[in-house]
From Swiss-Prot:
One GO CC term on file: cytoplasm
Organism: Mycobacterium sp. (strain KMS)
Protein name listed in UniProt: 3-isopropylmalate dehydrogenase
Annotated family: Belongs to the isocitrate and isopropylmalate dehydrogenases family. LeuB type 2 subfamily.
Gene: leuB
Required cofactor(s): Mg(2+); Mn(2+)
Keyword field: Amino-acid biosynthesis, Branched-chain amino acid biosynthesis, Cytoplasm, Leucine biosynthesis, Magnesium, Manganese, Metal-binding, NAD, Oxidoreductase
Annotated positions binding substrate: R87, R97, R121, D211
Amino acid sequence: MNLAIIAGDGIGPEVIGEAVKVLDAVLPEVEKTTYDLGARRYHATGEILPDSVLEELKVHDAILLGAIGDPSVPSGVLERGLLLRIRFALDHHINLRPAKLYSGVTGPLAGNPEIDFVVVREGTEGPYTGTGGAIRVGTPHEVATEVSLNTAFGVRRVVEDAFRRAQQRRKHLTLVHKNNVLTFAGALWWRTVQEVGAEYPDVEIAYQHVDSAMIHIVTDPGRFDVIVTDNLFGDIVTDLAAAVCGGIGLAASGNIDATRTNPSMFEPVHGSAPDIAGQGIADPTAAIMSVALLLAHVGETDAAARVDKAVEAHLSSRGDQELGTAAVGDRIVGLL
């Protein structure tokens, strides 16, 4: 495997260092190329993601990202110029977010119910395409629009991926949308789920409005196996899912090109946390869990399972220990 590494800003280099340590322990033959992208490069050169670097990224099998963002750079500059550019240039049309409450992790829900589902979120359409505008800005008659773009092609490929994942899991898929109000997009999503679902007769299909789904993620999370949803609703659902599983510090994600034409990118959900950068106290668990997602995606399923089991063993036995960044990485390597 040929891996591109973007450690990024803040705690990114620290947590990615431990993630790579675990990766080397389970798959030592990986070829790695590190790219200096983020705030430091921006300040030094004015560059965010040069075309030449983007072309280099495309030839890798996968990308491992730490975190992007620094208070010295105006908000949104790095996010749009780096993260969103990679997402659209590499057609990362799926954002994959597992939600699992591990043994030993105390979640906010009473009784620590069993939680194990995955959210398949559409990643390149919806209201995040920049389609819209404003007129009469700053006047009492200002009009602003944000258009949610949904295509049959874009919806189908995400729904197909979700069904494939459901078939490999507990064979239950829930579409989360708001089709009683968003009637046009909602109809396209629901019709597509029914059409694709006919090809997977063993997968049970359910529908929930997004507000209802948010309630049930809190009150009855065990009902969910695979959730498929659009870009906006997925953005919201995945953060609540992370919260009930112990927080974004334990959340991993994958930005996936399901066609495998381009390399997919894997990253912890947490931010760059510049306030604790360089102190050696950032928890690298989410970055290590992202390595497990990456390994599963490239077909190294045994290695992925080893990492996941080691993370679970670490979380279930750490107790109240306050471990530093390197200590967590060393401990998980020891549990492989």
